[in-house]
Each structure stands twice: as C-alpha cells, then as structure tokens.
C-alpha cells in the first residue's frame, strides 16, 4: 500500500528512480527476529513493492559495519540467500563507521575502522560475484551516533571544525580506492546527518549546520559538488598507503593527498592535510602539477577555494566572539559571512605550458583546498 500511495502521489517514473531499502541494521536490535525471518521479510517486501511498481529498485540489507563479525556474517548470509532463492536484488547496502576517542584530552579520529568496514564489505560482495550491482553505503560516517552531542560524548566535538571535513575527504578517497581494488560498483555514500532544533550553537551534533549557521563540513560537500566529469589519477609524495591507514589510521605522519576530476572544459583537484589527531600540527607546502590539459589552452583560470581556520569556517569566528549562545543580530550576520565556501584568493589566469600547469600553496593542519582550473 505504501508503494502504491507513493506512485499515486509522485508518479511511477519518479518513484522508479528511488531506492527502497527494506530495513535498517537488521543484524542488531533494530530487528527482533532471526536472520531467516529477515530473509522472509525481504522476499515479501520485494514482491510487494514490485507488484505495486514493476521495475522498482529494492535492496539491502543495510547492516552495520562488516568489520564486526556478526555484521559480516549477516551480509554474507543475506547475499547467499538471495542468490539461492533467486530473489531480486537491485542494490547492496551496508554501513561504515569510524571511532573517534578522547586521548590526552584531545579528539583522535578512527578512520581505520570506517575503511576496514568498507574493505570487508566490498570483499564479501566481490566473493559473491556481485561486482556489477550498485553498492550504497547508506550510512558512512566518522562514528555511529548522530544524535549524541559532545555533551554526551566529548569526542564528538570533532563535528564543529576542520577535523570533520578533512576526515571526510581522506575517507572518501579511501572508499573509491577500495572500490577500485575489489572491482565493485560503489554508487554512493550517505552522511547520516540531521537537523537538531532547539539545541545550543555548535553543541556537537552530527549536522551540517547549527541554528542556521553552516559548519565547515558542509563546505566540503560544496567543494565536492564543484568537481565535474570523471575521476582521474592522482599521486602524492605525502600520501599514506591505504593498507597502512586501514591497519593503524593516520597517527604519525599526516596524510597529504588529493582527489581529482576532469571534463572537456575543467579540471579540479581537491587536496588536504589530514591527521587523526585534533591537536595542532604543522602546515604542509604543496606543489601541484596538473597535466593532460588541451595543448591549445595556453592560459587557464585558477579558482582556489579553501577550508581552514580562517576560511569557510564560522566555528573559529564564533569561538573568537566568546562562544555566544544568544548571538546578536550583528554577530549572526558576521557568522553568516564566514559560513559559506570561500576563496583563498581572487580567481586569476595562469600560463599553461605543454598541457600542464603548476600551482603552489601552503596547506595548514586539517585544511582542504579545491583548485578549479577552467579553459
């Protein structure tokens, strides 16, 4: 009845583009039945949805992170079931979470755990020879409790400043590399973020804004939205090996790495200086060489966006104001002037030689730059 109602309200063509996930985290207490009873639920749900809308996309099982044995076995057994029973499965979903902690009075992120969850999940999918099926990481986050503020868990203070966006940049690069390694079809990863109304400013909930003030992490997603075309290869002398990050995180040297895309008229390079530890660290000089530009492009326009302590960051300004919980209209206006995605410098034209350009910048600890090159 639900699917039929949705079709009636929104139209079959629209609803056919949606992804129906049958349950949430049935491997833990959100599901009170046995795994076999979940298989039956899934089978009946697929039949019901498809009866109301032939061609609808239905999938799952939206388990917790497969880095844990129980979740690993549930996902593995579910894929065995749908194969043996020949039940339709249009996409595979599971969750991946990091594990931030307080160490020595400072937040230390747990990137290794999130990437390990994904590594194990992709391994299961590949072993079942379901490489072409879309995979949706329907929750991919630095930890598991969106509604736990830093008053509940002090480690969740990471959500306010530059640690969150730089973590997300490094994590997403790892997710794509793992998809390449296992030769699976990663369709999307979702940030399980919400709106929390009536709460303090920068209370540390997993949200993209706080009382109408955008957080730096939202500017990471704004940066990512500006990257067009296809992913292209990147190498960095400062990047850490993926296997080392999965094994032990980013605990010693920082991860100075990048992600790039290109289309017929633009190239974009996102680069970051990431470390699991919140505590202050050194800046990193970065020299970026972009090759493969059209030989006819003798001059290109560089637009340089930045997230750091003084750009695209209302949190540091709010702290400088004395962390007001009842900011004045003037203070709110000033915070809004800093909460959007900001340029590090005015756009400028630079010379390209032989289809290549070189750009130098300095990346502060936990900073992210987006270099957008148009021709």
Q: What do the PLM-derived regions correspond to, one by one?
A:
Residues 326-375:
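C-terminal beta-strand-rich structural cap/linker in extracellular carbohydrate-active enzymes
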Residues 244-322, 360-370:
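Carbohydrate-binding surface patches
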Residues 149-161, 170-195, 294-345:
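Substrate-binding clefts and catalytic carboxylate motifs of secreted carbohydrate-active enzymes
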Residues 182-188, 192, 197-198, 206-266, ...:
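Glycan-recognition and catalytic regions of carbohydrate-active enzymes
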Residues 1-30, 62-69:
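Active-site mouth of glycoside hydrolases
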Residues 8-14, 51, 83-85, 126-128, ...:
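Surface-exposed acidic, glycine-flexible loop patches that form ligand/cofactor-binding
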